[in-house]
Every structure is written in C-alpha cells, then in structure tokens.
C-alpha cells in the first residue's frame, strides 16, 4: 500500500526535478493557469480553467458537453495565450486520437513554459504569492453584499478561485 501511495505522489509531480540553486524573489505575471501548473493542480482542473478562459474571451463556445465539442470562433480574438491557441487548435481536430495527442502536446509545452519562466525565482515564495492572490479573490467574493454582486465577483475572479484545492466545497459554502 505504501508503495502505491508513493508511486501516485510521484506521478503528480509536473515540473521535472532540477539540481540547481533556488533563486530568490517572486515570479510575478503568471496567469492563473500557469499558477495552477506551478501548484501542481490536477490536469483536469487545469483543462477546465483553460476552457473557461477561452469561453470568457469569446474564442469558443460549447456545442455539446459530453463528449465536449467546441465551436471555435473565427477570427480568433486577440490576446490569447499560446496554451489557449493550442487548446483551440486541438478542439478543431475531429479525430479523437489526434485531439488527445494535441492536448497532451499543449500540456507538455505549458509545463515546460512555466518551468522556464520560474528559472532564477523562488518556487516557495512564488507559490505563497499566488496562494495569497487566490485568497484575496475569495475574500472579494465573500465580502460582496448581495447575491448578484457575489456572482459578478465570482465570475471576475473565477480562474483565481479555481486554484483553491477546496474549490468545490468553498464555492458551495459561499453561495449557500
């Protein structure tokens, strides 16, 4: 049992181990999706965050939920991140196997990109920084007076609140 648990933990690590001197300082400017990769959130949550991001930016709309089918808008809006463009490219693909391969490729590129951006910065300090952004996002939602304002704040801070490991339960508590 102990071996199975330790093997599972090892599989959860996205960022490759590196032997180097830890940098110092906070890496600012990461997106919520990149912060999720840094926090080693489950990949299904990261994919959901990317999906919500492209929908919010009007780059795609959901046609069917199960299996997930997207209608990618044309022309694409400006300001999409590389991982969002790769995500949309994958969903333009009709063949399920090719789509899965493109999504896997997108994920690997995203992880490498985050790893590259973190060079020279303190992982520990950066994690604490993005944890505090997530907490501030929740505080804004919780501080809202009316359900309408609460929903609006939640929509605005969705990507950051999703970083919470307790996202589902906390969302239920906030909107009770």
Features from the language model and the residues they span:
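Acidic, Ser/Thr/Pro-rich intrinsically disordered cytosolic tails and loops
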Residues: 1-176
